[in-house]
Amino acid sequence: MINNLKTFILLASLTALLVVIGGLLGGSTGMLVALLFAGIMNFSAYWYSDTLVLKMYNAEPLSNNHFVYHIVSELAHRAGTSVPKVYLINNSTPNAFATGRNPENASIAVTTGLLDRLTQEEITGVLAHELAHVIHRDTLINVVSATIAGAISGIANMFMWLSMFGHNSNNEEGVHPVVGMIMMIVAPLAAGLIQMAISRSREFEADAGGARISGNPQWLASALLKLDQANHEQYFDEAETHPATAHLFIINPLNGEKLANLFSTHPSTAERVARLRAMY
């Protein structure tokens, strides 16, 4: 219920932001166009954002005979929830995420690198963590916030170009360069804050929930240490291309030295591991 309310607030905020920008660009006509655009975007964010994210990462569905599907199925039955669809991302960087608007329409995606680097027990710990996100209904707000963060970044880029090429000396049309500069600075910060505020506390709850589902918190603790090390050693190219989706993953896939990772979307791995080890 709380996450549904958060989703409504995020969609309403996106609508308000677009309407304000539409007013700045085109007056009352711009506001109407922006309102229509926001309605389409909100509809798409709710119904299709999960499909879009899976396509971003070229995720392919796994068959019901794959051992990962069997693990997910067993965990779901143990937790008393619907069995999510399972997808595989062909990338050597080990990571995973869950998406979907509700438990009945959820999906879990893992990379080939995760299957190559982790033991079956560690894989079970990761899958239980992602299933906990599904049960807690984090997946809808996570994927909607990714859409909003991406939209904010796109709007910032639009203002940058308009401020550079759309302004004339009489200020009769176009966007004033100062407005463009403000949007260029504020919008990415707002996007980062949205992601950080939503995901950090939810990761702790999913860690604890996943540990209870799997029955062994040490499996996830061990997996997190391996995933953290691997993600510092190599780039996840698709994630670098789509930084607004970083908070979906169990471990932040972005390069820590980049400005795109100025705001941490995840708690520290050390703190997460310490909490898991203290559970039992």
UniProtKB/Swiss-Prot annotation:
The chain crosses the membrane at residues 7-26, 30-49, 146-166, 178-198. Binds 1 zinc ion per subunit. Zn(2+) binds at residues 129, 133, 203. It holds the Pfam family Peptidase_M48. GO terms for biological process: proteolysis. Its EC number is 3.4.24.-. InterPro entries: HtpX_protease, Pept_M48_protease_HtpX, Peptidase_M48. GO terms for cellular component: plasma membrane. Disulfide bonds: none annotated. One of its GO terms (molecular function) is metalloendopeptidase activity. PROSITE patterns: ZINC_PROTEASE. It is found in: Cell inner membrane. Its main location: membrane. The active site is at 130. Its cofactor is Zn(2+). It is a multi-pass membrane protein. Keywords: Cell inner membrane, Cell membrane, Hydrolase, Membrane, Metal-binding, Metalloprotease, Protease, Stress response, Transmembrane, Transmembrane helix, Zinc. Belongs to the peptidase M48B family. PANTHER family: PROTEASE HTPX (PTHR43221:SF1). HAMAP family: Pept_M48_protease_HtpX. This is Protease HtpX. It comes from Legionella pneumophila (strain Corby).
